Amino acid sequence: RFLKEDLSVKKDSSVPQILIYHTHSQEAFADSREGQTEDTIVGVGDHLTELLEKTYGYQVIHITDAFDMMGGTLDRSKAYDYARASIEKVLEENPTIEVVIDLHRDGVPDERHLVTQVNGKPTAQLLFYNGLSYTVSQGAVSYLPNPYIEENLAFSFQLEYQAAQYYPDLYRGIYLAGLRYNLHLKPRALLLEAGAQTNTVEEVRNAMEPFADILNRVLKGSDKEG
């Protein structure tokens, strides 16, 4: 049923329809240069923004705020809270936004390298991370309500379906976690893990090209089963 849900968006390049941000803005890669924002996940977000705007004609807002820095020190303890407050304000000011992407990179054992080949280029593999506001130990996490759990899952499933058709080795799957991760902000909200700390900047940037393609396919409503 997730594949049959209509998540298409009527494109209007005159208004912002996609929002990209980074709860963990300091995430970097194997060959990142210290102090160079373009070598972090924020730089990857810049590249994704450019692809979506120049190749596919969407208007994108990219928030580059450092929600995981406090007084110049890395502190992720309240990053999701800080991000939520900022994103809610942006959404209120831009009601045309339909898609919200929290772009991260994963953390894996140092010997693991999440890479494949796409169009002859080394490309970091991707993972969708979905929060269920539910844990085995306590059941529903009532203080983290999310009215869009099913829509969030449908969005991830449809993206994964498109990936399986066009880039079968690109995706690592969908990871189901117990909390909310600010996915309650929109039905088409996504937490995307692009590669990991063992990938190069180039590999992760390369992954944005196929991701932008499958995102556009889902938003167009094309090639959907059923």
Predicted regions and their residues:
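A short, glycine/acidic-enriched catalytic loop
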Residues: 109-145
